[in-house]
Structures are given as C-alpha cells and as structure tokens.
Amino acid sequence: MEIKQIITEIKQKLDTKGGLKHVYFVACGGSKAAIFPGLYLLQSEAKTFSATTYTSNEFVHATPKELDERCVAVICSLKATPETVKAVETANAKGAITIAMTGSMETGMAKVGQYVVVYSNGAPQDYSNSNQACSLRIGFELLHQIEGWDKYDKAMDAYQYINEIVDEAKKECLPAAQAWAEKEKDEPVFYVLASGSNYGVAYSMCCCHF
C-alpha cells in the first residue's frame, strides 16, 4: 500500500475516534536520525496535532501516558532491531496506529506493524524513496489530508528531482570533500553543528561517520 493510501485509511479510522492527537517518531541510531525530517516538518507546520520523538527502548520502558487510539506511531528500523520491534508492539498494545518503516517485508517490523512502508536501502539507491524521504512523505500526507496543507502539491512535485539533485551534488562536492578529509584527518576533535531539519543528519554524521 502506498503512503498516500495508508494515510487515507488511517484518517478514516481516526475520524471515528475524535481525530489525530499526536504523532510519535520512534527509532534508534541512524534510523532515528533518518526520520527526524518528518518530525521537524510536523512540529513546524501542524496546527491541530503535535509530534515528538523517542528512542525505541525509552518508548518501551517509559511509554508516554498520552499514547492511545488517537495517536500514530511511525517506527523505523532497517533490519528490525529487537527493541524497535518491541516499540511497535508497545504502541499496538496501547491502541495506537502503527506505521512500521523497514527494509523489507520479511523483517520483524513488517510482521507486527499495522501498516508497513518499505524504503530503498541498497544499491542502486532511490533517494526519493529513502527512509528520510518516506518520513517526510508521511508528514506531507498527514498535513494535506488532515489540515489541507497549502504546500502539498509543490512538495509532491519535488520528489521527481531528488535523485538528480543528489547525483549532481555527489559529482560537484566529492573532490572538495576528499580534499578536506585528507587535510583534516589527523585532527583530534570534530565539532558537528546543525539545527532545524538538518539536526538528524548532523547526529548521524557525528555518531556514525566520525
């Protein structure tokens, strides 16, 4: 099922329960960094519902009291780490609607999520269907279908350009990046700074790459 259809079905269910109240973005490590853009989008643009993020284990062991049938939990893990599978089960048990973002339909995430979004995660990579892109698409659809968001059409149109932009950026930036890396490789400390929608990228760069 496409993300657009998933959100349409979710909205129909929520409309019978009083509407959407809160969206939880749950993951750990690189997956948590990857879904951050969707969180930031909703925190910035949503008017009638709110959004927060949790690490998988925190969500399981310090489950928010607000979590109930009027909530959506977007939970992400490429290969379905045990604590993230448990996070999906925790949200299900509280009556929330779960969207499991994962690497294939064969993972433990796919088996327990009420809805499943399989994102591109290999070579060749489709960046318009990456975990980052899918988290944003979920956010765009929620804003559009629940609040009539006026930037929806432009956001959807932009997806067709993502792969081209990434390919061009790789070609243009790689030589400079390699030169910088060679120059700075012996530095004892690297400070990685970011804000806004780029925070997740900086988190991933700091923890996974440096």
Briefly describe each language-model feature range.
Residues 1-22, 123-124, 140-209:
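Active-site phosphate/pyrophosphate-binding segments
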Residues 19-152, 158, 195:
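Glycine-rich phosphate-binding loops that contact phosphosugars or nucleotide phosphates
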